[in-house]
Amino acid sequence: GYSKHMEKDENATIKSYNACEKILNKLLKKYKGSVFNTAGDSVLAEFPSAVNAVECGVDFQNEIKKRNESDKTDVKLEFRLGINMGDVVKKEDNLIGDGVNIAARLEALAQPNGISISKSVYDFVVPKTKMTFNDLGVQKVKQNEFHAFDILLDPSQKRKLNTKSKLNLPAIGAIVSAVLLGMIGFL
C-alpha cells in the first residue's frame, strides 16, 4: 500500500503521487469534477452526472496503468475507486452523509486498479455507455448494505463475492466521491 511505499522510498512515492495527482486533476477538469475534500491519500470529488464520474474513473485507471507500465521506478501506485450517487450535505467546504459513506465502502470493496459502483450509478450509466459490468450482488460493509457492481476494465478482473456476506475490508486510501461520489483509494 501507500504507507509501505512511503516507508520504503518516500521521495519516489511522493514523486509518483504527484504524477498521479496531475493525471487526476486533468481528468477532473475534463469531466467537470470538483474536489471537495482531501485527507491524506484520499480525495472527495463531486461530478455533474453519473456518466461523468464513471468515465473519469475509467480514464483515470487506464492512464495510471499506462503510467505504471512505463515508469522505471519501483513505486507503482495503484488505486481503488468507488462511485455512488446519493444524498449528501454540504458542511463548509466538505460533503458528508450516507452518499459519501457508501462511496467509501465501494472504494474499499473495489479491487486494486478497479472501480466498484452502486446500483443507482449502474442504472444511470448502463444505457449510456458500452462498459462491461460484473454484478457483485448485495454487499454489507460495516453498517452499510448496498448492491454493488464492478466495472470490468479487463475481463480478468471478474470476481464473485458472497451476496449479503459481511466484508471486513479496510478502508484503504483515496476517495473521489461525488453527489455522484467516486472514491479513489491508494494501495
Q: Where are the predicted features?
A:
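Active-site/binding-pocket entry motifs
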Residues: 1, 89, 155-157
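Catalytic NTP-binding/metal-coordinating core of nucleotidyl cyclase/transferase enzymes
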Residues: 1-56, 63
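Bimodal feature
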Residues: 12, 19, 23, 52, ...
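Noncatalytic linker/hinge segments flanking ATPase motor cores
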Residues: 32-40, 120-127, 155-160
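Catalytic beta-strand-to-alpha-helix segment of the class III nucleotidyl cyclase homology domain
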Residues: 44-146, 150
